[in-house]
Amino acid sequence: MKSLKSIIVKILAPVIGLAAILGLASCSKADQFTINESFTNISIDAISSDIVISPSNDGKCTVDYYGSTAMNFQAHVSDGTLKIEETKAKSIFSFLSFVKSNKITVYLPEGEYGSLMINGTTGDVTVAESFTFESADLSLSTGDTAFFATVSGDTKIDATTGDISLKCASVGALGIDLTTGDVSITGSEVSSLNISITSGDVNIVGLSCEGDVNITLTTGEIEMSSVECENIDVTGKTGKIVLDSVVASNNFNVKNGTGNVLFNLCDGANIKISTTTGDIDGNLLSSKIFTTQTTTGDIEVPKTTSGGVCDLSTTTGDIYITID
């Protein structure tokens, strides 16, 4: 009995051959749109393209598209918004694509813009540092995000699968919701930060936050260094948490399930750190009144009697604290 695979191949072979002969199969195309109308906001809706927003060399706005003829593409201005849309072509042969990857490149004059909205199904997103937006909302299914622009208001990034990298001069409230992937934030100023990840690592270096930092991670490691904020709340379930030079002016809370909590030159007015299985090992910048608890493990903390409360607990693990 012939396999199902061989039967499908025999059925599709003449179809593909006919499509190629008639020029109906999906090949590549290149389009360029010059945008002469003025606009403030930018909205991009793509199905299977990488998206790049880059500064133009001539001060003009152009949109370049390289992709499959199986896709329809258009760029126009409507009600003060530059709308860029990629949709599937209505063709019986649109599923026959020989283009490996599609790409949308938006060349913008450097300067300030209103809202930036990007909705992508499959593809990477890169936004250069030469722009300032009032707000940014990125929603991706599969693809990496590299965001370097300044945002005066809120920035929201939702993704199912992919890595997220940010290096911004300034951002308002930053919210990241990611199912699978890593988050990296470097040299940024934010009014608040909220990160929620199911599986992946978090790495933050050089963050100044006016308000609260909240990080929730199910599986993965959290590493933070040179971070200042008002309140910090870090919750992990499986994986170590490493903090270096992280200072909260108010509350400093860390909760872990399985994994060590390690910190150096950190501080907060009030500190609460707990882990179920793992050590708590750290160095603080100021005296604290310590309360400690471990079921299985050793405890060694300074015998100071001034400062805020430092509550440390682990079920299985050691507690070792020094004061710098």
Summary of predicted features, one role per range:
Residues 262-264:
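Short N-terminal helix-initiation segments at or just after the protein's N-terminus
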Residues 2-12, 16-120, 124-140, 144-159, ...:
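Acidic (Asp/Glu) and glycine-rich low-complexity loops/linkers
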